[in-house]
């Protein structure tokens, strides 16, 4: 309330203005009032909501980010006390200290933190996101050679020949990845009914992916979700791919999946990647080269680039909208082809 000495039209008007001003300040103060919460509780709240919005495999991956975030930031600090400079000091520690995380990984952590603090702003724990004005510190890193991402022709032959004689199921699976440029989860989750063989056209339909992250063998199954919208696609099969499909089906008679273990469960990524890693040197592959199931997808891209298939066609085939690795491999291969052409011209 407002009390003035006189009761006139002018003083009543003044009183009304003063009262409205007080109400406005009171409301502003109320809107600026934030609820106290410690950082670990905020992260827990955010992650609980996040897991309901994404695929379980994505949530499983992000769980690793969350673990590092809780090591970086004091879990008991009040969120309202966190500043941009505080965040910067924490990133400097994990990027340049014993942790020595890469810029790429730091970027994903920054993205996750920004989402967490945005949640805090929207739920009354913060008035401003401390990540908004934060830029990652620059870090000098060794540039990876593009050739590390795919197998050369001789390397591919060494791997496939070894797999064919040492593990038939893995050989068929890796051939399928290479011939069709599929992701592990797309190929491992592909059902026999997803492949269409006809006189007019042979193709496989990518309609989902294997949901495997953090699950036991009997819990793993295909879900009708893919990494991106572009991942939903039909992939044409050549004659060799059809042959691989037929052989794989003969080995998985007791399963609806094209590729399975002897017990009928889908092939697990950790099993096949461990096999590739442990047998790499016996295959004749350089011990420093990273060999995993994903390299066959990149090798498929490199082969299409060698065949001068346009980049946008390659991206559509492998289910990429705008993937830097695909583009880098393409440019590397086409540049190498141009250099080879120049040398051949000198022989004319």
Q: What residues fall within each predicted segment?
A:
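Basic, Lys/Arg- and aromatic-enriched nucleic-acid-binding interface segment
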Residues: 107, 122, 126, 132-184, ...
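DNA/chromatin major-groove-contacting recognition/catalytic segments
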Residues: 216-218, 307, 328-348
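Short, basic (Lys/Arg/His-rich) helix/loop patches that form interaction surfaces
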Residues: 161-170, 180, 235, 249-257, ...
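DNA breakage-rejoining catalytic core of tyrosine-based enzymes
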Residues: 80, 126-128, 139-161, 205-207, ...
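N-terminal core-binding DNA-recognition domain of tyrosine site-specific recombinases/integrases
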Residues: 8-11, 47-125, 266-268, 286-292
């Amino acid at each position: 309330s407002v009390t003035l000495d006189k009761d006139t039209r002018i003083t009543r008007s003044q009183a009304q203005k003063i009262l409205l001003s007080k109400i406005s300040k009171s409301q502003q103060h109320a809107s600026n009032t934030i609820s106290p919460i410690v950082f670990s509780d905020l992260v827990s709240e955010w992650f609980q909501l996040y897991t309901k919005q994404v695929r379980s495999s994505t949530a499983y991956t992000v769980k690793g980010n969350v673990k590092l975030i809780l090591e970086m930031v004091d879990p008991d600090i009040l969120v309202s006390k966190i500043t941009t400079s505080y965040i910067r000091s924490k990133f400097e520690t994990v990027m340049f200290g014993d942790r020595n995380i890469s810029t790429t990984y730091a970027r994903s952590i920054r993205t996750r933190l920004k989402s967490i603090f945005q949640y805090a702003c929207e739920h009354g724990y913060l008035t401003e996101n401390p990540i908004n004005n934060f830029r990652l510190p620059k870090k000098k890193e060794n540039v990876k050679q593009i050739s590390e991402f795919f197998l050369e022709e001789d390397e591919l032959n060494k791997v496939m020949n070894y797999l064919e004689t040492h593990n038939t199921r893995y050989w068929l699976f890796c051939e399928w990845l290479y011939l069709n440029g599929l992701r592990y989860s797309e190929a491992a989750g592909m059902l026999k009914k997803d492949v269409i063989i006809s006189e007019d056209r042979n193709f496989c339909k990518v309609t989902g992916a294997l949901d495997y992250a953090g699950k036991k063998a009997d819990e793993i199954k295909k879900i009708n979700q893919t990494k991106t919208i572009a991942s939903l696609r039909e992939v044409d099969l050549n004659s060799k791919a059809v042959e691989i499909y037929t052989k794989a089906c003969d080995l998985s008679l007791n399963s609806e999946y094209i590729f399975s273990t002897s017990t009928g469960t889908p092939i697990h990524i950790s099993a096949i990647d461990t096999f590739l890693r442990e047998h790499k040197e016996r295959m004749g592959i350089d011990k420093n080269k990273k060999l995993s199931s994903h390299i066959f997808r990149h090798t498929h891209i490199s082969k299409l680039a060698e065949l001068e298939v346009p980049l946008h066609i390659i991206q559509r085939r492998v289910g990429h909208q705008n993937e830097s690795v695909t583009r880098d491999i393409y440019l590397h291969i086409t540049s190498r082809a141009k250099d080879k052409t120049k040398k051949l011209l000198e022989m004319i």
